[in-house]
Swiss-Prot record:
Residues annotated as binding heme b: H88
GO biological process, one term: hydrogen peroxide catabolic process
GO molecular function, one term: peroxidase activity
Source species, domain of life: Eukaryota
Record keywords, A-Z: Acetylation, Heme, Iron, Metal-binding, Oxygen transport, Transport
PTM sites of type N-acetylserine: S1
Further remark: This fish has two hemoglobins: Hb1 (major) and Hb2 (about 15-20% of the total). They display the Root effect and the alkaline Bohr effect, which is enhanced by organophosphate and to a lesser extent by chloride.
Domain Globin stretches: 1-142
Organs and tissues of expression: Red blood cells.
The name this protein goes by in its record: Hemoglobin subunit alpha-2
Name of encoding gene: hba2
Gene3D superfamilies in UniProt: Globins
Its biological purpose: Involved in oxygen transport from gills to the various peripheral tissues.
Length: 142
């Protein structure tokens, strides 16, 4: 679970990086689709799945808006993200294992884009936060 220090660290880091969330989302989703090609099955309805394409950029931004929303609901992610959990479980039918894959790619992009701010302590807190976010999104799968 997230400690008070983790929550403070996540909020502080997010305030530094959120202005670049479109770029973060685009790069993280682009990487996921290339490095983990099995994830493309969820996006087969898109005309183009290449890194940086319009649909990838758009969904990357959507994902990062969700991350930003989760930061604002960090005190109760499960209740705060119930609608998103239902969407992913019942409508989109996304395998929850993919939340871990995307979280990993988001962390990679943080490290690349913010090498001075993404310290080991920030890395730990963001990793714990993204894992908690994934668990909250998986809530309706039970």
């Amino acid at each position: 679970s997230l400690s008070t220090k983790d929550k403070e660290t996540v909020k502080a880091f997010w305030s530094k990086v959120s202005g670049k969330s479109a770029d973060i989302g685009n790069d993280a989703l682009s990487r996921m689709l290339v490095v983990y090609p099995q994830t493309k099955t969820y996006f087969s309805h898109w005309k183009e799945l290449t890194p940086g394409s319009a649909p990838v950029r758009k969904h990357g931004m959507t994902v990062m808006k969700g991350v930003g929303d989760a930061v604002s609901k960090i005190e109760d992610l499960t209740a705060g993200l119930m609608e998103l959990s239902e969407l992913h479980a019942f409508t989109l039918r996304v395998d929850p294992a993919n939340f871990k894959i995307l979280s990993h790619n988001i962390l990679v992009v943080f490290a690349i884009m913010f090498p001075n701010d993404f310290t080991p302590d920030v890395h730990v807190s963001m990793d714990k936060f993204l894992a908690a976010l994934g668990r909250a999104l998986s809530e309706k799968y039970r």
